Amino acid sequence: MLDKSSKIYVAGHRGLVGSAIWNNLMQRGFTNLVGRTHKELDLLDPIAVREFFDKEQPDAVVLTAAHVGGIMANLQYRADFIYRNLQIQQNVIGESFRHGVKKLLFLGSTCIYPREAMQPMKEEALLTSPLEYTNEPYAIAKIAGLKMCESFNLQYGTNYIAVMPTNLYGPNDNFHLENSHVLPAMIRKIHLAKCLNTNNWEAVRKDINLRPVEGVDGNCTDQEILDKLAKFGITPQAVTLWGTGKPLREFLWSEEMADASVHVLLNVDFKDTYAEGAKEVRNCHINVGTGKELSIREVAEKIMKEIDFKGKLQWDSSKPDGTMRKLTDVSKLHALGWHHKVEIDEGIHRLYEWYLKGICINHQTT
């Protein structure tokens, strides 16, 4: 259905997954790609989105753009997480339908599954019991997105596919201490602690000039920097992380998520996502992950080893852990012809090397 000349709009092409999907498509010879930054196109604005689709008339759409963040952000900004994500999805999926887009790929999240879902989580676990409280608004928005895709397909015969990635990490990740996900946040915290531990103030100032922390940048005094970093559990002697470190998590390298996404975009149709002859068609989304898990503590220790931080690792058990276990069942993805290759140790090494290059992306809406 799609060929190398097809116009493909990647919504969120500067973000963690979007940038990787863009690069993957380019490497496969798809050069008629369209992307807009948040400044160029506000996906919360229905008029702007409609005008964009009127002008560009894409053949396919990859919707990676979302309002995202870690536990702290999800707890504090609950209205933002449900409202903004619903609005983005409503605008992009709605205009894709109005403009006859041939294929749409929607990226969700495994937080759609119940807090007490049986492990590993199959697609059929969706809506079987209550969600994790901390990110419930975000999860409900993502469930609405996948149900929009499913419902348009059933009512109008469209070809919209929803994929649910596990925890992702990789180039162009968000390392801001206030609102990033767990693995990049740990890399930055442990990196800064090592710099403080080795008295490498040049590296500390370079880091916080690139990504200021609550208004504190490299022009501030040593004490101001120390005080602010201590608020986030970063000291020369130790790094303090949220929770107990006991929750088990699965991590997928973002460039592999991109490869899986493009594989689905090019090779999987809606009819391939459910059993033929089913009386009730539901749970047509596809989990994307490794099917392997390890504890947050183990991840932190691997990062400590990679960065060579000689200080201590401490845990603040007064802070929430989130769901204790989240492992995807990826048998559906495997049956559709895709398997992961990059393991966690290699991924951490690659990501820290990328981080040291000093690249910073604006993650306001990616």
Positions of PLM-derived features:
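NAD(P)H-binding glycine-rich loop region in Rossmannoid oxidoreductase-like domains
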Residues: 35, 46-86, 95-98, 115
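Active-site Tyr-X1-5-Lys
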Residues: 133-166, 182-199
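SDR active-site strand-loop-helix element
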Residues: 11, 36, 64-65, 104-110, ...
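C-terminal substrate-binding subdomain of Rossmann-fold SDR/epimerase-dehydratase oxidoreductases
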Residues: 12-16, 20-28, 192-366
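Active-site segment of SDR-like NAD(P)-dependent oxidoreductases
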Residues: 68-69, 110-118, 166-169
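Short-chain dehydrogenase/reductase
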Residues: 82, 86, 134-146, 176-184, ...
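Hydrophobic positions on the long internal alpha-helix
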Residues: 88, 92-96, 148-149, 260, ...
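Conserved Rossmann-fold NAD(P)-dependent oxidoreductase catalytic core, especially the SDR/UDP-sugar
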Residues: 4, 90-135, 161, 174
